[in-house]
Amino acid sequence: VTTTYDWVQQGTVRAELEAAEARTLAPWAARSARSAGRGQPEPEDPVRTCWMRDLDRIIFSRAMMRAHGKTQSFIPAFSGEGPAAGRQGGPYIGDHYVTRATHMQQTARIAATLAQALALNVPLASAIATGHDLGHACFGHGGEAALQQVAPGGFDHARQGARLLTLLEPRNLTAEVLDGIARHSWKHDPPSTLEGMCARLADRIAYLTADLTDALRAGVLAGVADVPAEVRRVLGDNPTDMIGVLVEDVIRHSRGRPHVAQGDACAEVMTTMRSFMFERVYLRPEAERQTERAKRLLTDLYGHYLEHPDTMPMGASLAEDPVEQQAVDAIAGMTDRYALAAWKAAFALHAV
């Protein structure tokens, strides 16, 4: 008698999922049965495809836990300025702001919607999108700018994410997921899969609309009327509408075709919106001051670790690497709160 347990142990569930992919996905979609595999071969999971397994490994990682404490754009540790003004020198954003973790969750949902509508591999798109920003430093743009300045050879959060998941906190992910994470940024060549392109487009849709929401909530923008008229004319008058319009545009211009792309009109207004967000939000004077504070804090901490490598957090880097790389890995893995506490401990101070 064959029991349900026997079916599970024999991999019947996974095999059925792989067969469903072969029947239902577009010819150009990635198929888990054809994955290029993992760095370290291991037995297949009996009930999950390889990319379902990767998604779970990313969600359950320590890096994902820390991502909840990393800034996306607004730095809670420096909050305080704005219509609801506090006293600490930054926009007051309360508890409802986007962190790296919530940004990755939102990106993953958008990527999954795109992949589903385009008959692509949803678990692969979800895994890439869920882990795409794990390599980001604390303090948002300021943290990355600091590490770019001090790290030998510069710092790239996309490459750092792949390094993190391969070497520092190895999850033995598939080649396709690591490729999508390492190449999700628009400054890199496109990822090797269309599912990676879903994650890349979803990232931009998610961060622009979420950062707009945070800017409105913090009072950095007086209202949606501040957004350029041409953007509102195409995308609508609130961030939720904007997400829907942008997602439907990608589907309309990609469905039934071996590519994932936007239409010209939406691509143009996204460029306009991105320029607007840099001018009015990311590079506004207060944001620049916060960025400089973050850069100074992390630059100080980097120098301290070069002089006192024994004070670096244990397990955050590889002992065989040069001390400069160890310091970069240690700092890149920190949450905002941990970095601030480490700086205070290193310099016996209580304010930045």
Region locations from a protein language model:
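Short active-site segment of divalent metal-dependent hydrolases/proteases
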Residues: 134-139, 206
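Conserved short loop/turn motifs at secondary-structure junctions
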Residues: 131, 148-149, 318
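Short alpha-helix carrying the canonical HExxH Zn2+-binding catalytic motif
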Residues: 126-131, 135, 201-202
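Conserved N-terminal alpha-helix of the aminotransferase class I/II PLP-enzyme fold
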Residues: 106
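A glycine- and small-aliphatic-rich helix-loop capping segment at beta-alpha/alpha-beta transitions
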Residues: 140-152
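Histidine-centered, transition-metal-coordinating active-site segments
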Residues: 1-101, 109-114, 120-122, 143, ...
